[in-house]
From Swiss-Prot:
Role noted for this protein: Catalyzes the NAD-dependent conversion of D-erythrose 4-phosphate to 4-phosphoerythronate.
The protein, known as: D-erythrose-4-phosphate dehydrogenase
UniProt-annotated site: Activates thiol group during catalysis, residues: H182
Annotated gene: epd
CDD domains: GAPDH_C_E4PDH (cd23937), GAPDH_N_E4PDH (cd17892)
Length: 339
């Protein structure tokens, strides 16, 4: 059965999801039937075809009025600001992938359901009242058919949670801190401009900019036992894609660098294959652009202090890796059936 999906919000993640669907060869499993995006159709088609991070799209992209033609597929375009007015029932939509960055509450999810969708997957963290928050590779097996309004967490949560799980299962984490070194995002100006966050008034290309992050809350959402045991900070750096995460944890077991790297390398080839990767090559951030993994552990940067303090560096393409996990979670939700 082919799952019929609609994408609400066709920005960085929305477009990456559609591109990843075609590049990964999953079109027999998932079909994008519709896109809702306030931007004009010409801009939608142009930015799908040409991308500053991911290059030219290999498929032909054409416009026929408000139909986006990708290869031989026709995708309906809507420009509706009121999600309750979207024709999901008429189109037979199974799952809405909400990538707007605006909607994320249970009420927002219910509006999609009221419009006729069977399930909703948010491409960003949601409230505690959602049916589930999924980090694929870690807890998707807990999904049930009753989970209709789901969050796929965030790109950084998807990056760090598998690594925390591996370290905790093997060495028993006591506490930790996380520093996210994140590529610039579209809420930052090219030159100084007004923003309610005064640090984000500054030009994205000229500074390393500290920003607020809810990553610690995202960790405890997946692992409640770590409540008040993790803290996180985030800085934005003047690159347009790929993020690094500096994870430091204290553990009960005595550890060595070799033990940690052996664990990561083995897990990348077995239990977390396709989710976690491992490298000891002398790479830099741009080398991980367009990488579909949630996390790539840089074994050259693993450190241990006093046998119980671990520091690791983990890379991710914060767009492409997350887009691929959106597809994975979509399939996992569909596998539970529709009520």
């Amino acid at each position: 059965m082919t799952i019929k999906v609609a994408i609400n919000g066709f920005g960085r993640i929305g477009r990456s999801i559609l591109r990843a669907l075609y590049e990964s060869g999953r079109r027999a499993e998932i079909a994008v039937i519709a896109v809702n995006e306030l931007a004009d159709a010409e801009g939608i088609a142009h930015l799908l075809k040409y991308d500053s991070s991911h290059g030219r799209f290999a498929w032909d992209v054409r416009l026929n009025n408000d139909v986006l033609q990708v290869g031989d597929d026709n995708i309906r375009l809507f420009h509706q600001s009121d999600i309750s007015m979207l024709p999901w029932q008429e189109l037979g939509i199974d799952i809405v992938l909400d990538c707007s960055g605006i909607y994320g509450s249970r009420a927002d999810g219910e509006a999609h359901l009221a419009s006729g969708a069977k399930k909703v997957l948010f491409a960003h963290p949601g409230g505690n009242d959602l049916d589930a928050t999924v980090v694929y590779g870690v807890n998707q097996h807990l999904l049930t058919a009753e989970d209709r309004i789901v969050s796929n967490a965030s790109c950084t949560t998807n990056c760090i949670i598998p690594i925390i799980k591996l370290l905790d299962d093997q060495f028993e984490i006591e506490s930790g801190t996380v520093t996210t070194i994140h590529a610039s995002m579209n809420d930052q100006p090219v030159i100084d401009a007004y923003h309610k966050d005064l640090r984000r008034t500054r030009a994205a290309s000229q500074s390393i900019i500290p920003v607020d992050t809810k990553l610690a809350a995202g960790i405890t959402r997946i692992f409640p036992k770590f409540c008040d045991r993790f803290e996180a900070i985030s800085v934005r750096v003047p690159t347009i894609n790929v993020t690094a995460i500096d994870l430091s944890v204290t553990v009960k077991s005595s550890v060595t660098v070799n033990k940690i790297n052996e664990l990561m390398q083995k897990s990348a080839a077995t239990s977390f294959r396709g989710i976690v990767d491992y490298t000891e090559l002398p790479l830099v951030s741009t080398d991980f652009n367009h990488d579909p993994h949630s996390a790539i552990v840089d074994g050259t940067q693993t450190r241990v202090s006093g046998q119980h303090l671990i520091k690791t560096l983990v890379w991710c393409d914060n767009e492409w890796g997350f887009a691929n996990r959106m597809l994975d979670t979509t399939l996992a939700m569909a596998a539970m059936g529709f009520k």
